[in-house]
């Protein structure tokens, strides 16, 4: 199996293309400071991860900024703090401040020459526009949680994507799902019968960061530590 075997790359955005962990850590600082305690970045990411996914399951039709507001409330309660309205609103709308990884734009611009590029993201359409402006390419298809009515790892999100691409003439065997999160992406991609590439952004770090702990270790067909590494591997594959 080679990277050149596929026609479409379907991407998770946050954690894969956008550095949501930096964004989340920064956005949680005001609330964290009010505890009077010192948290490591991983501790902040873990409290986010164990509150975000349950909230998405409870309110699958909510816009992502409303998910973030609810996550803020859950974390404040966990820490024994009263919510602050201004903090809550800033956290809820913090996606606009989340940066792209340094290698993302160059890698996407290269890969765009060889594949259809597709987004499958736990976000709403308006929030994704803010991130899309940082990614440097025009995606061929954009599928959000708002479009589907649920959040990954719900299998409906993958069924929706596979069906949408089939209508565009792209068969499931021609799709390479490309993502960081084992929980949100690789387990349901396995279950959907998709080939997948793991962008292991947390290589060298312990734990799962801002993502929920996966129930099992899924199969991944390719593994790269960055999007830049994936683009370079494609160049080498072309050389044979």
UniProtKB/Swiss-Prot annotation:
Catalytic activity, EC: 3.5.-.-
GO biological process, one term: response to toxic substance
Active site: residue positions: 12 (nucleophile)
Phenotype for residue 12 to A: Loss of catalytic activity
Primary enzyme class: hydrolase
Protein localization: Periplasm
Keywords associated with the record: Detoxification, Hydrolase, Periplasm
Catalytic activity, as annotated: (S)-azetidine-2-carboxylate + H2O = 2-hydroxy-4-aminobutanoate
Highest taxon listed in the record's lineage: Bacteria
Keyword Signal: no
Name of this chain's protein: L-azetidine-2-carboxylate hydrolase
Taxonomy of the source species: Bacteria, Pseudomonadati, Pseudomonadota, Gammaproteobacteria, Pseudomonadales
